[in-house]
Amino acid sequence: KDLVILEDEVRESSDELIIMTDDGSYGEKGVVTVGIEKFINQEEHVDKVFAIGPPIMMKFCCLMAQKYNIPVEVSLNTIMVDGTGMCGACRLSIGGKTKFVCIDGPEFDGSLVDWDEMFKRMGTFRDAEREEMEHYEEHLRGVEKKTDVCGCQTCMDVEPTNESIEQLIDRDAEWRKELRAAMKPAERKAIERVQMPELDPVYRATTRTEEVNKGLTKEMAIREAHRCLDCGKPACVEGCPVNINIPSFIKNIERGQFLAAAKVLKNTSALPAVCGRVCPQEKQCESKCIHLKMNEPAVAIGYLERFAADFERESGNIAVPDMAPKNGIKVAVVGSGPSGLSFAGDMAKKGYEVHVFEALHEIGGVLKYGIPEFRLPNRIVDVEIENLKKMGVEFTTDCIVGKTITTDQLEAEGYKGIFVGSGAGLPNFMGIKGENALNIMSSNEYLTRVNLMDAANPLTDTPINVGKSVLVVGGGNT
């Protein structure tokens, strides 16, 4: 029964549902073709048979339908691989002609499919798959033996932690004491600060959409985490605008509990993967690091924050932070930029019903239209937004508060609070002669066209002028 899927949905849209299992443990006993023949014999007329499932099952469904001269349509999506036809795995003979399932299908007339050829093609990958699986298992065994910088077995966790947030941030927890005792402060200070791997400069010049900073490896992150002295009064926390418990998430990285580190981050920050990339840590948390007082580089807090958030995302175990019970109070947020999203996340964790209103067609504000892909990929932002949705935050796009809907209307709809995070959408010109001439653009306009509207792509219809000589006024990040 556990292998039967979509039963309720199929039953709801069908006049009759027959379930067949080989051993009769659920539904009727017998293979699918037995059920088909039984149904055909009890009906006056059957127009068509549709078969979706394992290829061998679809073949015999076709043979059964042909026995009664009933047309049959099969879906061969089970043999598709890359979806482009380039790999050739789904190349088949359909009615004597070469077809690609992912391009020409996946639905075909079952009577035209050369099933024997199909099974042969599928069989050609069997030995290769078995060999690759052996290589993969060998790789896993190698990972299990891998050790970290201090020589102990590395706990490369991929399962969500069962420890509470209180246990993960407790400086007096036994695991935390053991970490402090394992290395002397002088040994930690002797470790050089990690260098973030970057794209090759020559290759970087050929792409504007690939992230320049490649992120830390597990080994690099653990080594950098060893540099943290786990101060009793951590000044780095005071330097963080949202007061992340920085030593706690770093120490969880040091012991190899990367998902636990992400949990600590998300207890305070709604956008750890974003902040790990674009926050000016050198002016905030890292500027308070005790290493600087000893004329040593600060702990790479931003790199480690990004690592923990990226590890959680890539592991597939994206967790929702601890949530307070719903209090029934509605709060509106104007703007879906970093301030709006952060506020929305904080209020959702406190139990409020949060609704974000965004003027543009995409959520993210400056994270989407202002920061280039090579520094902050949109896919990273989208994952953070999706996590907010899982927390219960609702979003409405193409809605200008004040025009599409007024604040009075929001209050009438029951919103008890309105947070305005509209950002700096309008540019500030200098008021000099000629600044309104053609081909002079504010940074807001340029970045919106290039980042959000993909103007640099010749296939899009968003206009942008490319000059031989370009003057840039301003030397900041923009």
Spans of features found by a protein language model:
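Ferredoxin-type iron-sulfur electron-transfer modules and their immediate structural context
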Residues: 30, 55, 105-106, 114-327, ...
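N-terminal Rossmann-like dinucleotide/flavin-binding domain of flavoprotein oxidoreductases
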Residues: 262-272, 304, 367-415
